[in-house]
Amino acid sequence: MNATAMHRIVELCLRLDNHASRLYLSLARNAGTQDLQGFWQDIAAKNEQHQLYWDQLLNWADKGMLNNLFDDPRKTLDELSGLEERVYDLADNCAQVRSKKKAFTMAFKLEFYLLHPTFETLSQYVATFNGDAGSDFSYERFVNRLFDALQQNELGTLELELVGEVIHRLWKENRRMAFLSNYDELTGIFNRRGLFNAITHLAHLAQRNENTVGVLMIDIDHFKAVNDNFGHQFGDDMLRRVAGSIREGIRASDVLGRYGGEEFLVFLPRVEPLSLGEVGEKIRRAIETMPDTRASVTVSIGIAHGHVGREVDADVKALIYQADEKLLAAKAAGRNRIEL
């Protein structure tokens, strides 16, 4: 059900993008000047270049790699369906627009509709795995182009400029909220939700490539005592520094997240089992020898590895459970150690 719902969500976003292209082409046909016609045509052409982006997301959706991206896919579907009706009507109405000012008003209205958080959530998800591949979706650059075109056509009225500024501010807030839904604000690494979204994606790739994957469960020893003796501000700083040390000890292709409290999880999407002990020991030593700290900081680490079969989610959960059991064994054996 989730894979089907996610396919429909991405498909709706693609259709909305296509309606936007149709609207901008209508504005181009009725622009009145060559410069303005070229401006609207260029925006429509850039929208049409997003096809590869949507094709990739549709492929991921069909493989179940987006299943945990939204809390309530049905609600998202309903909202996007209602949005499509409004955007479709707006694009139809643009066919008769001759006024330059009304053309920009219609463009801002369209972009207001397309501020639905789904677009930013998908954009940040793609950027996580494709680097800056979502840069064509740079909303900031796009809004700045609209502002420039307003000024060049002497249409920079207070009302239109205010609408543009509101849209820009709403986009920035959408971006911030999408980030916070997947990242831990304190440490800057994935939170539990973002962590599992990333792991699900990489686990599917590992299954396809038949790679061995690894899981490290890392827990700060006696963290409650640190908070009690030195205060929560010191404890927060320790969490940030431990997260930084772990990040420095793993590859860029590995995934690090805050699993909960003082516990961290590292997912290695491709690993040689014999090297896992070295990775764990490297992290343990780096944290034990962190400079400039008033309290002794050590961690216990549980490590598991295996292959991902057809039941991707179940296999990942089984590996995490195994790593957690190893972590408990490390604690029972005296802490500040790794267990394979």
Predicted regions and their residues:
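Catalytic-core segments of nucleotide cyclases and related cyclic-nucleotide turnover enzymes
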Residues: 277, 306-339
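Conserved nucleotide-binding and Mg2+-coordinating catalytic segments in signaling enzymes
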Residues: 179-197, 206, 218-232, 240
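Carboxylate-rich helix-loop segments that flank metal/cofactor sites and access channels
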Residues: 59-101
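Nucleotide second-messenger and two-component phosphorelay signaling modules
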Residues: 176, 201-214, 218, 229, ...
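Alpha-helical transition-metal enzyme core signature, strongest for iron centers
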Residues: 13-21, 40-54, 108-115, 139-150
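GGDEF/GGEEF active-site signature
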Residues: 241-312, 340
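Alpha-helical bundle segments that constitute or directly flank the non-heme di-iron/ferroxidase center
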Residues: 1-31, 102-122
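Signal-transducing coiled-coil linker helices
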Residues: 130-137, 141-186, 193-204, 254-255, ...
